[in-house]
Structure formats: structure tokens, C-alpha cells
Design a protein with these regions (language model features):
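General helical structural elements
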Residues: 6-7, 295
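A broad, structure-centric signal for solvent-exposed, well-ordered loop/edge residues
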Residues: 7-8, 112, 251
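Short, charged N-terminal helix-start/capping segments
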Residues: 14, 80-92, 170-175, 227
Length: 298
């Protein structure tokens, strides 16, 4: 039995090692180079807050968050409840990798959209001018503002406020609110870090690969719809990059802790992460990219 277990363990390791080639991974990796981030290295106040719509939204910044945790930062995440006990429970397990605390905004999906019905594809973008008629903005904004000011973070991590990564209305809604609250001095972190992709990553992962995947399943690509609706060329360009290769094992463990449905969703934007071991995968995808926003100078 012991010998059989060793053989099975070796076989599993072999599958992960050979599941996808370095050449194939490199096809989707960033080719651009940006300045290395300095602010997070020198900050003496070490409190970070992640404000996102959904539990799995920090996937593309989870290496950086793991690194900060190792450096003694206190980290809290605020996001909507999924309305699914199994999914929320999986998030609580995943959160232990780099979070000190996670708090759910207790408004389930069917109650967040005022126009909710079975015909709606919830991830498809909507005009920003319609947010006030589609969401209870006053309630959502009040909760988020209160929670941010109670925690008083040094840094807030969000998705970008222009298209929320790939156009999901709830991504845009929360990221834009945090951005505007920061600019209007309603909240007082020292920096906003918006997780973004480089142009080459967007072209290869979101424009090409995601469009083909969605087309096979008969669904529209929200990213392409968001570009057209918001009149954008893509996400905002990064200001900095952060090398996260030293946190490869923790980031891979975080990504794989989610339930199967969420792992498939993450796989749209983090290609082939389930078909490789951490060391090989993050030797290629070894950087995370951020737009950094500083306080307004009055």
C-alpha cells in the first residue's frame, strides 16, 4: 500500500509537471516591463484592504497580497456574499493564506440588481448611467464607505474603475465608487492599487482566448462588449510591476482552494493554472501589475 501511494504521488506530480509546456504558458505572459513598485516596500503603516465585488476577484493580485502578509501587513477583504454557503465557506478557507479578516456585504446576488430576473446575464456590462436604476447605490455605498473608514487602510486594492477587468457591472460599480471616494477625500488611504493586465495580456488572454472560449459555449465575451460600451482600448495601463515568484506555492494554493465553478472562472483569466505546478507556472507568470493612484493635491 505504501509503495502504491508513492507511485500515485509521483504520477500526480508528473501530470502537473507535464500538463502544459513553458512555450504554451509564455504565449499568454506579459511582454512589457514596468518600474518595480517601491511604495509597498517602504511604507511603515502596514494595513491593506481589498474591496472587490466577488470572493475570487483578487486572483490576479494574490501573489502581492501574500508577499505583504509575509512582511507583516494586516489585510482585510470586503466583498459581496455569494449567497451560497459552500462557496463562502471555500472562500473562508482560501482567505487564510493571506487575509487576517474577510467581511461579506450581506446582499445576495438576486437582491443586488433591482432589475434581477432569469433573462439577465449578470456579468455583461451595462452603461454607467444606468447604475442608479439597476442597483441600490445608496445602500451599497454606505456600507462600503463605513467599512473602509472603520478599518482605515494604508492601501486599498481594487480592480480598475474604468471597466472592472472585463466589464462585470459589480466590478465597475465598487471600483468606481472607491476611486471617487478617494478623489473626494471621503476615504484616506495613502494609495489605491488597481489590479490590471498589460496590453499584451489583454490581447492574448481576453480578446483572443476568452472570445474563442465563450463562442464555443454560445455566450458573449463581456470584455469585448465593455470595450465598445465604455469606448476604451482596454484596462488602464500599469504603473508598476511586482515580482511574486517567491510566493508561487501560496498563490497556487489560494487559486486551487476555490470550488470547481470558481476555479473554472478564474481559469478564463489565469490560463492553465490547474495544469501546471506552482514553480513552473509562476516562473512564467512571475509578475503582477497595478495602476497606482495617489491622493489629489488640493
Amino acid at each position: 500500500m505504501k509503495r502504491l501511494n508513492i507511485i500515485l504521488l509521483f504520477f500526480s506530480f508528473y501530470l502537473f509537471s507535464c500538463g502544459v509546456s513553458i512555450k504554451k504558458l509564455n504565449k499568454y505572459a506579459a511582454i512589457e516591463v514596468y518600474p518595480e513598485d517601491e511604495f509597498l516596500k517602504i511604507s511603515t503603516s502596514k494595513k491593506a484592504m481589498i474591496v472587490v465585488a466577488h470572493d475570487d476577484d483578487p486572483a490576479a493580485m494574490s501573489g502581492t497580497l501574500t508577499m505583504l502578509k509575509k512582511q507583516g501587513w494586516k489585510i482585510k477583504q470586503l466583498c459581496f456574499t455569494s449567497g451560497n454557503q459552500s462557496r463562502d465557506s471555500a472562500m473562508l478557507i482560501a482567505s487564510k493564506i493571506f487575509l487576517d479578516e474577510i467581511e461579506f456585504i450581506n446582499i445576495p446576488p438576486q437582491m443586488r440588481r433591482l432589475d434581477f430576473d432569469s433573462s439577465i446575464i449578470p456579468y455583461m456590462p451595462i452603461p454607467k448611467s444606468e447604475f442608479s436604476s439597476k442597483f441600490d447605490l445608496e445602500k451599497i455605498h454606505s456600507i462600503v464607505l463605513t467599512k473602509i473608514n472603520e478599518f482605515a487602510p494604508t492601501v486599498i486594492f481594487t480592480l480598475d474603475n474604468e471597466m472592472g477587468g472585463y466589464g462585470h457591472p459589480e466590478h465597475v460599480l465598487l471600483s468606481e465608487f472607491v476611486f471617487n471616494a478617494f478623489k473626494n477625500n471621503q476615504i484616506n488611504p495613502e494609495r489605491l492599487y488597481q489590479s490590471v493586465y498589460t496590453n499584451s495580456m489583454e490581447d492574448k488572454i481576453l480578446k483572443d482566448r476568452l472570445t474563442n472560449q465563450m463562442k464555443k459555449w454560445g455566450f458573449p465575451n463581456s470584455y469585448m462588449s465593455a470595450l465598445k460600451m465604455y469606448k476604451l482600448d482596454g484596462m488602464p495601463e500599469p504603473d508598476v510591476q511586482i515580482n511574486i515568484e517567491s510566493c508561487a506555492e501560496e498563490k497556487m494554493r489560494y487559486l486551487r482552494t476555490f470550488n470547481e465553478r470558481e476555479r473554472k472562472t478564474i481559469g478564463f483569466y489565469v490560463p492553465y493554472f490547474e495544469k501546471s505546478n506552482a514553480k513552473k507556472y509562476f516562473s512564467v507568470f512571475n509578475r503582477e501589475f497595478f495602476r497606482v493612484i495617489k491622493p489629489s493635491i488640493n
